Amino acid sequence: MESEKDIGAKFLGDYRILYRKGQSLWSEDLLAEHRFIKKRYLIRLLLPDLGSSQPFMEAFHDVVVKLAKLNHPGILSIENVSESEGRCFLVTQEQDIPILSLTQYLKSIPRKLTELEIVDIVSQLASLLDYVHSEGLAQEEWNLDSVYIHILNGVPKVILPDLGFASLIKERILDGFISDEENRESKIKERVLLHTSEGKQGREDTYAFGAITYYLLFGFLPQGIFPMPSKVFSDFIYDWDFLISSCLSCFMEERAKELFPLIRKKTLGEELQNVVTNCIESSLREVPDPLESSQNLPQAVLKVGETKVSHQQKESAEHLEFVLVEACSIDEAMDTAIESESSSGVEEEGYSLALQSLLVREPVVSRYVEAEKEEPKPQPILTEMVLIEGGEFSRGSVEGQRDELPVHKVILHSFFLDVHPVTNEQFIRYLECCGSEQDKYYNELIRLRDSRIQRRSGRLVIEPGYAKHPVVGVTWYGASGYAEWIGKRLPTEAEWEIAASGGVAALRYPCGEEIEKSRANFFTADTTTVMSYPPNPYGLYDMAGNVYEWCQDWYGYDFYEISAQEPESPQGPAQGVYRVLRGGCWKSLKDDLRCAHRHRNNPGAVNSTYGFRCAKNIN
């Protein structure tokens, strides 16, 4: 670990450098903390010689634009791209646990990987490559250290940290191999075995994927005429031959375009063929001819009642080389056991009859079908609600923006409103129920990198200490969808303003005519736990500050003029471009916290200051 003096800069833009983590072939990796929000990030500072190359920077810019749109646990998500003192740097999520390259991970395990462990790693890599190929990106430049394994709670997760960038620094990678005198030969050979000569985007990845899978199975890369997995691992249940041949085909057009479907189990027929092959090769043994053995014995040794096998019986026995018998019970199986040479003729006849009865019986084979287990869906955590009595109220203000005029009367029916904004622990259950961060119309519900909810190892988790904080990074679609999921709705703009003012006409802030930092969370560095500040006259918490709250209405600049003419339960314009947000947030100034202050944004907009609370009709 190096100190800040070793790095040569205490701050890099808005980020305070904590220490240097290492250096890759194209970046210097630093751990930093944002000076305002106090959150840690991994900064990848571009090396000076690369930053001065105009062709490289143009290609680098194109890759960054594509990567910024991706959202996959196997890719280091880009939070921000900035420049300081002429050096470009990327801001990515902090990795708390060390990351091992694939070869380092395999060396750390004192045994060979099991088939299911190989399936897990290969499935993750295939899913990741299929995803990036669909987005127009590819790894292209491969070696065994291109794949990294992130150990999270003892579970290996596959990551490609240099995805998109490796192809930009091919010459630098080759120079690195040549300068490494100790491992030069093995590294160059490894690169040759992982690449083809076609150079078509995506097909290089397909070939390398097949070669890496082969390496996980055998411990070496395929070269020349190599053995197929079925010849060595006959007891494996997955069809590795199909995957290897689909990826390592000599003809580029025959290589698979999608990788994940290649990971499949063997068919029932293939498994049966393996069983029969194993039986024939390992279970059969030479049985001496009882006729010959009896002929070689003296006549005095032959027991009374024994008869020699006729020529016809011997002939039929030569044709019967192997018989596979399925017994329906243990008793029947025991009946077919080979009797000792001392068995009587009656016992041999009983054995023949038992064997014949098994052979003529219709075999019955039933397929095992695992009973489906219906997993219980997550249940919502409901919020206590406050009843807002209906009546005539005043809304608007003369001290704000033009869209707050005119001050006018509105008539509202009684309704319920949540006492606090929806929290992370409540919203995560909605995401688990949806199974995605998008709704059925592909509208984004939440952007995880702008929230305190993360997806790790395929599971959604909340950052420690943020379960009771209001959910942020949520779109209007996510807020509306959550409300519908629990049988509620979003409040209208009129309902929200009247609820914030506590029913008091012309009240400036929810807590009174003035507001201090002891009364609300504003102009700070982050959200706070809900209900941390005193409630307003209605008993509602966080109506000022903490997070902006989505409302049901479309925003209309002059809608108050229409509302003054039609005061009965106003609900905003019939259509529009923006949806209404109210209440100010943790980084707002005082003016944004006024009860009458209006804010708006696109319904699909994502921000670390946007949250919501729910309302409900009386009936």
UniProtKB/Swiss-Prot annotation:
It catalyses: L-seryl-[protein] + ATP = O-phospho-L-seryl-[protein] + ADP + H(+); L-threonyl-[protein] + ATP = O-phospho-L-threonyl-[protein] + ADP + H(+). Coiled coil: none annotated. Its EC number is 2.7.11.1. The keyword Kinase applies. Residues 15-302 form the Protein kinase domain. The active site is at 141 (proton acceptor). InterPro entries: CTDL_fold, Kinase-like_dom_sf, Prot_kinase_dom, Sulfatase_Mod_Factor_Kinase, SUMF_dom, SUMF_sf. Pfam families: FGE-sulfatase. ATP binds at residues 21-29. Autophosphorylated on serine and threonine residues. Disulfide bonds: none annotated. PROSITE patterns: PROTEIN_KINASE_DOM. GO terms for molecular function: ATP binding; formylglycine-generating oxidase activity; protein serine kinase activity; protein serine/threonine kinase activity. Keywords: ATP-binding, Kinase, Nucleotide-binding, Phosphoprotein, Serine/threonine-protein kinase, Transferase. It is an enzyme of class 2 (transferase). Belongs to the protein kinase superfamily. Ser/Thr protein kinase family. PANTHER family: FORMYLGLYCINE-GENERATING ENZYME, SULFATASE MODIFYING FACTOR 1, 2. Together with the serine/threonine kinase PknD, may play a role in the specific interactions with host proteins during intracellular growth. This is Serine/threonine-protein kinase pkn1. The gene is pkn1.
